[in-house]
Curated annotation (Swiss-Prot):
This is Homoserine kinase. The keyword Kinase applies. Keywords: Amino-acid biosynthesis, ATP-binding, Cytoplasm, Kinase, Nucleotide-binding, Threonine biosynthesis, Transferase. The keyword DNA damage does not apply. Its main location: cytoplasm. Pathway: Amino-acid biosynthesis; L-threonine biosynthesis; L-threonine from L-aspartate: step 4/5. The lineage of its organism: Bacteria, Pseudomonadati, Campylobacterota, Epsilonproteobacteria, Campylobacterales. ATP binds at P84, M85, S86, R87, G88, L89, G90, S91, S92, S93, A94.
Amino acid sequence: MTISVPATSANLGPGFDSLGLAVDLRNVVEFHPSKFFSVSIKGEGENNPKLKGNNLFISIFNEHYNRLTKKKQNFKFNFYNQIPMSRGLGSSSAVIVSAIASAHEAAGIKVSKRRILNHALVYESHPDNITPAVMGGFNAATVEKNKVFSQKKHLPDYIKAVVVIPNKQMSTAKARTLLPKSYSKESAVYNLSHTALSVAAFFNEDWEILKIASQDRFHQKARMKTLPELFNVQKVAYESGALMSTLSGSGSTFFSMVYDEDSEMIASKLALKFPEFAVKILNFDNDGLIIDK
């Protein structure tokens, strides 16, 4: 059995803990019953020996498999990871979602994407990453009574993502400590209005307004100060024609949305200006979680 989950970019602009989208950079896990437990990793994390034992995936998988079957069974897991770890591209959400889906498949129990999403909420209390990881596309999401409520927009082929990935990790927990403890009414209204406009822009495919709509006063500046070069990344992206340019998740990756015809030019300018960072052009992913038996 094979499970794959895409990378995600969340906290989009003013959409703190509420807006996210999926990009075509995937973590894949293949698994089957085995006499002995074993883990192999290729790609991201392959040189980290701690991940080859009782990692987050294995812990969540075992929890759900044992709950569903009431029995013990060893499995061989082969991981093929493309999503950089702790870079603001949803690596943790990919692990959580793939573990839950894998456990249900291993137990022979069909489960809806919505059910998997709500299970994932136990491990990731904010829906902006886990929702696009499961559903794909652009998502506006909220949590009410321990359930995720969301709306998805399919993203067209004529827009692309350009991501700038610094060689610096940023944990979500640490990034949250950088945020203000309170916000003014003015800032709250600013972000509410810009979030509403951002959602409307995505659903109406009115991309040109995103440069205004994606402005934020809640989280980006406080987090970007830990890596000041990101302010210049955003400046160069906008000067080169990006439709929106925003911190991805809690960082350190910076995400820009661009027209397909501009993607090579914008990526080249960013790579030339910031040679110490990785720059990738990515398609958007509209599938989310994929299960192949």
